[in-house]
Curated annotation (Swiss-Prot):
Keyword Secreted found: yes
Localization annotation: Secreted
PROSITE patterns: LCN_CSAB (PS51863)
Family recorded in the similarity comment: Belongs to the long (3 C-C) scorpion toxin superfamily. Sodium channel inhibitor family. Beta subfamily.
Name of the featured protein: Toxin Acra III-2
Keyword check for Disulfide bond: yes
Role this protein plays: Binds to sodium channels (Nav) and affects the channel activation process.
Domain LCN-type CS-alpha/beta, chain residue ranges per copy: 3-67
Disulfide bonds: C18-C41, C27-C46, C31-C48
Tissue expression as described in the entry: Expressed by the venom gland.
Length: 76
């Protein structure tokens, strides 16, 4: 069964380019920033499993998931 997901987008609205296909630490970190726990390099771009539409864009993901008290002193 195919796991749903999406290609996350960076601050420029572009997909994250990756060179090591499959298991990829960079992509895992990117996917965590976008609010999901796992991703990998597919077709030279990071793919995040279970990444929802609302979190594809990095700015949306930060708004939805960031817990930085300097950015959000009163929480969310």
């Amino acid at each position: 069964a195919d796991v749903p997901g999406n290609y996350p987008l960076n601050t420029y609205g572009n997909m994250y380019y990756c060179t090591i296909l499959g298991e990829n630490e960079f992509c895992k970190k990117i996917c965590k920033v976008h609010g999901v726990s796992y991703g990998y390099c597919y077709n030279s771009y990071c793919w995040c499993e279970y990444l929802e539409g609302k979190d594809i864009n990095i700015w949306d993901a930060v708004k939805n998931h960031c817990t930085n008290t300097n950015l959000y002193p009163n929480g969310k």
